[in-house]
């Protein structure tokens, strides 16, 4: 089934910034995809093309990316008579047309919008759910429901508080199903709201970009204490573990780290990577912290390797690896981390995302599928995580519709699978099939 027409437009993401949406038409109908964008972006990510016209959307318009889809990528794909099930062929053609290392000609946001829409159309052409089509593309005979990592306390670049570390997450690994994991997560979230309100007042329960609370606390340990209290109040101390996304590149300063980076600069308070690693180890010792993402700067390889060897927990590469096979290969060689954060817009096509996932998994790593802080109502990543069998997803708190859109889609998938549904649970790092 060939492509009849492709049209792109500017729409808005959850932060009110323009982003790219693509409509792809085949004789089976219309297939629509929207592209997310991040706030704390790694310097090695594929280029998200913005207009940089300060008179329009403060320079954040995506008119050029839309134009490239409508005038170049779309017409080229329509005239090639390609079948939408040929995901790799279509993605490789777009990559060749762009011709740059980081997709800077057309923009990763232009390519990704088309790539996602093609994938949705491919599933319809085969008459299968999107997650099954993705599983086929990845060579997975089985599918698995992930453990959700709910980002319930926000700091860093995602919130206006003093907290340096960006995300404090709860993972209901003790649940028996995705549906139960959602219930546990929602109950802890509401308990946390009450705990924060009692301690810091009602305005402390305002939410950040990803639906988590952003109380004005400075000590990262205090965020963990709040989580511990809420988990106990909800009655789930044996069913929940904690994950963190430190996003340390955001407060990296000349080989050291500034845990009060939102205050006026003061080099005397910077701490060494060893001191920061000690702080992480104290978290692991005193709280059920089992996963830490981006504990150090994206180029601080030595600190990563040392910490991964010593910590014994899941160490997730995001800014370090940027879903890029070259960066992943280097991280494997350096033993810098043991889990990949998979963000489709960091690399720009479905095919390359699948390649990155397979590379990580073949080297014994875990993989966590992720949203971005600037999201849309698109639910592609819910099907992606099921099809790729990664066992873990982070797509915000159980709050804000652009976050719940993904979680609700996972509930539907679990229901559709019925007795065949398998939930990763405690095996979230390396899901197993019985």
UniProtKB/Swiss-Prot annotation:
Its EC number is 4.2.1.11. Binds two Mg(2+) per subunit. Required for catalysis and for stabilizing the dimer. This is Alpha-enolase. It catalyses: (2R)-2-phosphoglycerate = phosphoenolpyruvate + H2O. It comes from Xenopus laevis. One of its GO terms (biological process) is glycolytic process. Pathway: Carbohydrate degradation; glycolysis; pyruvate from D-glyceraldehyde 3-phosphate: step 4/5. Signal peptide: none annotated. Mg(2+) 1 binds at residue 40. Belongs to the enolase family. Keywords: Cytoplasm, Glycolysis, Lyase, Magnesium, Metal-binding. The active site is at 210 (proton donor), 343 (proton acceptor). Its cofactor is Mg(2+). Homodimer. SMART domains: Enolase_C, Enolase_N. NCBIfam families: eno. GO terms for molecular function: magnesium ion binding; phosphopyruvate hydratase activity. The keyword Ubl conjugation does not apply. One of its GO terms (cellular component) is phosphopyruvate hydratase complex. Substrate binds at residues 158, 167, 293, 318, 370-373, 394. Mg(2+) 2 binds at residues 245, 293, 318. It is found in: Cytoplasm.
């Amino acid at each position: 089934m060939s492509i009849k027409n492709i049209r792109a437009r500017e729409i808005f993401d959850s932060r009110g910034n323009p982003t790219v949406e693509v409509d792809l038409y085949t004789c089976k109908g219309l297939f629509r995809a929207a592209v997310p964008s991040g706030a704390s972006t790694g310097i090695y990510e594929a280029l998200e093309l913005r207009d940089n016209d300060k008179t329009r959307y403060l320079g954040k318009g995506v008119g050029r990316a839309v134009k490239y889809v409508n005038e170049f990528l779309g017409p080229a794909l329509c005239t090639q008579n390609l079948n939408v099930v040929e995901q790799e062929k279509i993605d490789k053609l777009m990559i060749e047309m762009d011709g740059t290392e980081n997709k800077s000609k057309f923009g990763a946001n232009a390519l990704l919008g088309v790539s996602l829409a093609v994938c949705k159309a491919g599933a319809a052409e085969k008459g299968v759910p999107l997650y099954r089509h993705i599983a086929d593309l990845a060579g997975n005979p089985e599918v698995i429901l992930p453990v959700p990592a709910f980002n319930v306390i926000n700091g860093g670049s995602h919130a206006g508080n003093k907290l340096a570390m960006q995300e404090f997450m709860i993972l209901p690994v003790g649940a028996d199903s995705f549906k139960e994991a959602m219930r546990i997560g929602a109950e802890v979230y509401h308990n946390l709201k009450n705990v924060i309100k009692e301690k810091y007042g009602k305005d402390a329960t305002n939410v950040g970009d990803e639906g988590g609370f952003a109380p004005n606390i400075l000590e990262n340990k205090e965020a963990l204490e709040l989580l511990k209290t809420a988990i106990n109040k909800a009655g789930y101390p044996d069913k929940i573990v904690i994950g963190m996304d430190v996003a340390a590149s955001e407060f990296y300063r000349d080989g050291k780290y500034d845990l009060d980076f939102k205050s006026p600069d003061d080099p005397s308070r910077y701490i060494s990577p060893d001191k920061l690693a000690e702080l992480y180890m104290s978290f692991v010792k005193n709280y059920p912290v089992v996963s830490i993402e981006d504990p150090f700067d994206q180029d601080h390889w030595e600190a990563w390797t040392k910490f991964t060897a010593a910590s014994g927990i899941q160490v997730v590469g995001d800014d370090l690896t940027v879903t890029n096979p070259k960066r992943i290969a280097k991280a494997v060689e350096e033993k810098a981390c043991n889990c990949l954060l998979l963000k489709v817009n960091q690399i720009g096509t479905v095919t390359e995302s699948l390649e990155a996932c397979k590379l990580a998994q073949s080297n014994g790593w875990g993989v966590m599928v992720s949203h971005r802080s600037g999201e849309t109502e698109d639910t592609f990543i819910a099907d992606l995580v099921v099809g790729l069998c990664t066992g873990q997803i982070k797509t915000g708190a159980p709050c804000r519709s652009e976050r719940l859109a993904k979680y609700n889609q996972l509930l539907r998938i679990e229901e559709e699978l019925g007795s065949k549904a398998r939930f990763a649970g405690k095996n979230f790092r390396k899901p197993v099939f019985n």
